[in-house]
Amino acid sequence: TVPGVKFGLAFSEASGPCLVRTEGNDEALVADAVRAAQAVAAGHSFYLVMKNAYPINVLTQIKACQEVARIFCATANPVQVLVASTPQGNGIVGVVDGAPPKGVESGKDRAERRAMLRTFGYKF
């Protein structure tokens, strides 16, 4: 658990009424998650939008859910979702996460990266 975390969750059903189901404690984040779910329009997918927390703070708990088969990304970067469409519907093929590399890190870059990762909760 993360004190003060705000979140919005949207889940796209793939059978029955095929609704986007929602949960959350912040209406704006729930609305963001719903927009993502509707834009991708792929059944059995969920979208979690958070603030006041990092993905690493919740990723282990999400992966431990028996209903979660795959996580395509957990990031604060801009993403593009690759969707395949068939007559039956849409399916997520993959995710483009962030931008391509611009170079190789220096010693200073490495120290800054490690300091940043420690703020996210990573341990070395």
Annotated model-derived regions:
Residues 1-110, 114-124:
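Conserved mixed alpha/beta catalytic, RNA-binding, or beta-rich assembly cores of soluble enzyme
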